[in-house]
UniProtKB/Swiss-Prot annotation:
Main location: cytoplasm
Top-level EC class: transferase
Places the protein is found: Cytoplasm
Any one annotated GO CC term: cytosol
Protein name as catalogued: Polyribonucleotide nucleotidyltransferase
Needed cofactors: Mg(2+)
Residue span, KH domain: 559-618
Matching PANTHER family: POLYRIBONUCLEOTIDE NUCLEOTIDYLTRANSFERASE, POLYRIBONUCLEOTIDE NUCLEOTIDYLTRANSFERASE 1, MITOCHONDRIAL
Entry keyword set: Cytoplasm, Magnesium, Metal-binding, Nucleotidyltransferase, RNA-binding, Transferase
One Pfam assignment: RNase_PH_C
Source organism: Janthinobacterium sp. (strain Marseille) (Minibacterium massiliensis)
Length: 711
C-alpha cells in the first residue's frame, strides 16, 4: 500500500531522517524530516497550469507550529492555534528566500508549500528541519526547480565553528547564522552576531555551505528512490518581434528617465514612458489591422529592458541612477529629541530614505511574554517597524504588519541587541518603534541607525554606536560591481542584495539574498570589505551628531527605577495580608513596585520624590529592630501594666509601666496617651520577635546628667 522511502544521515552532532511515500500522498511532494525528536512534515502542491493572464509567480510558504508538538493545549476560549506568531512568519520567510530564485523564469504555476511542526525537542529548533523538508518536498515533486537546497545553522563558540548547535549551545555562542544554498552556490544568509569580524562571518558562511552538502546528497538519494517523474515543462517562446519593437520605441525614453535623480520625478517619467510605448505599439498594430499587444507582456519586456540599461551603465563605470559612484553613501542628516513627550526620539535621513524612531522605557512588567513552542520566555527589548504607503508616495492598506515589516523589524532588532547594556546595568524594558516616513532603499538599515540614536536620546547607555548599510551587486560574466547604499530600483535590478549592521568593532547582523549562482567567496569578500567602508562612514556621521559616551538624560516622562535588595524572608512584610500593604504603598506614593523571589525590589515612578518615599517606606517595613538602639515610637494602646509602642511599621513592643519613668508610676495614663510620640530604647527581643522597650533607658542614654541628678 505504501511505497515508503527512508534516508538517514549524520549532520553535525545530530542524525537526520528523511521519509516520503507514507504520509500526505496526494500532495505533489511530501517529506517527513526528523532531527532527534523534532519532526516536521513538509508538503508541496503545484498546479498543473498557470492561470490565464497571470504575469507573476504565485509561490506561498506557510510554516505552522502545532502546540501538540510540545505536548500542550492552546490557550484562549477556542483552544485552537490562532494567527501566525512572529516566529512562524520569520521562518516562512527564511524558507521562501532561498527557494524562490530557483524556479525557472516564466514558470507561473501556483506553488504552495506548507510545513507543519509535528513534534519538537526544545534543544533543536525546527527551522532547519523545515528548510530541509521544503527543499526535499520540492525535489521529490518533480516540478521545475533548480535544487535541491541545503540549510545549516552555524554557531561560533570559543573560536570554533559549530554545525547546528543546540539551544543550550547557542546561549554560549557569539554567532547564530543560518545559511542556505545549492551544491555550487550560497543563496541566503540570516545572522546575528556579537561584533564579529568580516573574516569570521564569511568563514561561517563558507563552513555552513561546505557542511550542507550532506543534506543535498541525501535529498538526491531520496529523489532517486522515491521521487515522482519530472514534470515536462518548457517556457513559452519569447516574442522576439515584440521585444524588438518595444526596445525600438522605449530605449531612448527609458535612458532619458534614468537621467533624473529625484525618485518621484523619475517614477513619473517612467510611467509616462510606459504609457507612450503602449500607445505607440497600439497605433502601430492598428495601422496594419492587428490587435494591440498585451500590456502585461509589454510591461515585463519594459522591466527587463530597464534592468539591462541600468546594469550595463553601472558595469561600464557610468554614474548610478542618482549620480553617485559605486562606493558613495547618500547624504545623511540626523536630529535627536524630535518629539517632546516621548522618552527618546531620532530622525535619521539618508538620501530619500527616512526613519523616525521612537524609544519608550518601561519596567519588567512591560516585558513581552512569549509563549513559544520551545518554551515560554520574556523579552525586554522590542523593535517594531512600520512602513505606511505614503513613504513611497502611494496609497494602500493600513493595518496589521505584513511579513516584510515583521522581517525588517527583526533584522533591525538583531543588529542592536549586541550593543544594549546588560540587564544588571540597565533594568528597563525598551520598545523601539521605527516609523518609515520616506523610503527609497535600505529602510531597515535606517531603522538600525535611527534606533541606536533614539536609544541614546532616551538615556540608554549603549555600548557603542550601531549602523547598518544595504549593499547590492551586479554581475555579468566575469565583470561585477558592488554598490554601496542601494536605492529601491537598484535592489530590484541587482543579482545580490545584502545588509550589514554593526559597530566599529564588528558585525552584529548580516542578511544576504542572492538571486544567481555565480557569486564566489572572493566576490563576497570584496562586497563585505566595501560594506565595512560604508558602515564606518555612517558611524562617523552618527558620532558627530551624538558623540560616544554622551548618553542623554532620562526624559522627565520616563519612569525612574530604584532597585533595592531586601531579605527574602521580609517579602511578606512588604506585600502584607492579601496584598494590603503593597497596594496601599503603590496607591499612596503613585509608584509601581515589583518584587522578585530573590528579594530584589524595583520601584518605578515618573516622580523621583515619590520613588524615594516608596523606597524609604519599604526600608522601614523590612528593617530589623536592633537591640540597644533608640527609636522614635508611637503609642498605639494603653494597658494597666504599660503601653504598646510601635517603633517601626509592623514592629510593636511592650513598654512596661516600670520602664516609663525613674519615679513610681501609678497610672500609665498620667504619663502617656494614645498617638503620643515617645523615645524608647529596645532592651531585648525574644525568639518570637517580641520587643521589650524602655523610656527611662532612652532618657538615661540621651541625657545622662539630668537622669543622674533625678536619681
Amino acid at each position: 500500500m505504501f511505497n515508503k522511502v527512508t534516508k538517514t544521515f549524520q549532520y553535525g552532532q545530530h542524525q537526520v531522517t528523511l521519509e516520503t511515500g507514507e504520509i500526505a500522498r496526494q500532495a505533489s511532494g511530501a517529506v517527513l524530516v526528523s532531527i532527534e525528536d523534532t519532526v516536521v512534515l513538509a508538503t508541496v502542491v503545484a498546479k498543473k497550469d498557470a492561470k490565464p493572464g497571470q504575469d507573476f509567480f504565485p509561490l506561498t510558504v506557510d510554516y505552522v507550529e502545532k502546540t501538540y508538538a510540545a505536548g500542550r493545549i492552546p490557550g484562549g476560549f477556542f483552544k485552537r492555534e490562532g494567527r501566525p506568531s512572529e516566529k512562524e512568519t520569520l521562518t516562512s520567510r527564511l524558507i521562501d528566500r532561498p527557494i524562490r530564485p530557483l524556479f525557472p523564469e516564466g514558470y507561473l504555476n501556483e506553488v504552495q508549500i506548507i510545513i507543519h511542526v509535528m513534534s519538537v525537542n526544545p534543544e533543536i529548533d525546527p527551522d532547519i528541519a523545515a528548510m530541509i523538508g521544503a527543499s526535499a518536498a520540492l525535489s521529490v515533486a518533480g516540478i521545475p526547480f533548480a535544487g535541491p537546497v541545503g540549510a545549516a545553522r552555524v554557531g561560533y563558540i570559543d573560536g570554533q565553528y559549530v554545525l547546528n548547535p543546540t539551544t543550550s549551545q547557542l546561549a554560549k555562542s557569539d554567532l547564530d547564522l543560518v545559511v542556505a544554498g545549492t551544491e555550487i552556490a550560497v543563496l541566503m544568509v540570516e545572522s546575528e552576531a556579537k561584533q564579529l569580524s568580516e573574516e569570521v562571518m564569511l568563514g561561517a558562511v563558507v563552513f555552513g555551505h561546505e557542511q550542507m552538502k550532506a543534506v543535498i546528497d541525501a535529498i538526491h538519494d531520496l529523489v532517486r528512490d522515491g521521487g515522482k517523474p519530472e514534470v515536462q515543462w518548457s517556457p513559452a517562446p519569447k516574442n522576439e518581434a515584440l521585444i524588438s519593437r518595444v526596445a525600438h520605441f522605449a530605449e531612448a525614453k527609458l535612458r532619458a528617465a534614468y537621467q533624473t535623480k529625484d525618485k518621484q520625478a523619475r517614477t513619473t517619467k517612467l510611467k509616462d514612458a510606459f504609457a507612450e510605448v503602449n500607445n505607440e505599439l497600439a497605433a502601430e498594430a492598428a495601422s496594419i489591422g492587428a490587435a494591440a499587444p498585451d500590456t502585461a507582456e509589454v510591461g515585463n519586456i519594459l522591466f527587463d529592458l530597464e534592468a539591462k540599461i541600468v546594469r550595463s551603465q553601472i558595469l561600464e563605470g557610468e554614474p548610478r541612477i542618482d549620480g553617485r559612484d559605486t562606493r558613495t553613501v547618500r547624504p545623511i542628516t540626523i536630529r535627536t529629541g524630535v518629539l517632546p513627550r516621548t522618552h527618546g526620539s531620532a530622525l535619521f535621513t539618508r538620501g530619500e530614505t527616512q526613519a523616525l524612531v521612537i524609544a519608550t522605557l518601561g519596567t519588567a512588567r512591560d516585558e513581552q511574554k512569549i509563549d513559544a513552542l520551545m518554551g515560554e520566555y520574556s523579552d525586554r527589548f522590542m523593535l517594531h517597524y512600520n512602513m505606511p504607503p505614503f513613504a513611497t508616495g502611494e496609497t494602500g492598506r493600513v493595518g496589521t504588519p505584513k511579513r516584510r515589516e515583521i522581517g525588517h523589524g527583526r533584522l533591525a532588532k538583531r543588529a542592536l541587541v549586541a550593543a544594549l547594556p546588560a540587564p544588571e546595568d540597565f533594568s528597563y524594558s525598551v520598545r523601539l518603534v521605527s516609523e518609515i516616513t520616506e523610503s527609497n532603499g535600505s529602510s531597515s538599515m535606517a531603522s538600525v541607525c535611527g534606533g541606536c540614536l533614539a536609544l541614546m536620546d532616551a538615556g540608554v547607555p549603549m555600548q557603542s554606536h550601531v549602523a547598518g548599510i544595504a549593499m547590492g551587486l551586479i554581475k555579468e560574466g566575469s565583470k561585477f560591481a558592488v554598490l554601496t547604499d542601494i536605492l529601491g530600483d537598484e535592489d530590484h535590478l541587482g543579482d545580490m542584495d545584502f545588509k550589514v549592521a554593526g559597530t566599529a568593532n564588528g558585525i552584529t547582523a548580516l542578511q544576504m539574498d542572492i538571486k544567481i549562482q555565480g557569486i564566489t567567496k572572493e566576490i563576497m569578500q570584496v562586497a563585505l570589505a566595501q560594506a565595512k567602508e560604508g558602515r564606518v562612514h555612517i558611524l562617523g556621521e552618527m558620532e558627530k551628531a551624538v558623540p560616544s559616551g554622551t548618553t542623554g538624560e532620562l526624559s522627565d516622562f520616563a519612569p525612574r527605577l530604584i532597585t533595592i535588595k531586601i531579605n527574602p524572608e521580609k517579602i511578606r512584610d512588604v506585600i502584607g495580608k492579601g496584598g494590603a500593604v503593597i497596594r496601599a504603598l503603590t496607591e499612596e506614593t503613585g509608584t509601581q513596585i515589583d518584587i522578585s523571589d530573590e528579594g530584589v525590589v524595583t520601584i518605578a515612578s515618573v516622580d523621583a520624590a515619590a520613588g524615594q518615599e516608596a523606597k524609604r517606606r519599604i526600608e522601614e517595613l523590612t528593617a530589623s529592630v536592633e537591640v540597644g538602639k533608640i527609636y522614635e515610637g508611637t503609642v498605639l494602646k494603653l494597658l494597666d501594666f504599660g503601653a504598646i509602642v510601635q517603633v517601626m511599621p509592623g514592629k510593636d513592643g511592650l513598654l512596661h509601666i516600670s520602664q516609663i519613668a525613674n519615679e513610681r508610676v501609678n497610672a500609665v495614663a498620667d504619663y502617656l496617651q494614645e498617638g503620643q510620640q515617645v523615645r524608647v530604647k529596645v532592651l531585648e527581643t525574644d525568639d518570637r520577635g517580641r520587643l521589650k522597650l524602655s523610656m527611662k533607658a532612652a532618657v538615661a542614654e540621651e541625657n545622662p546628667e539630668p537622669a543622674a541628678a533625678q536619681e
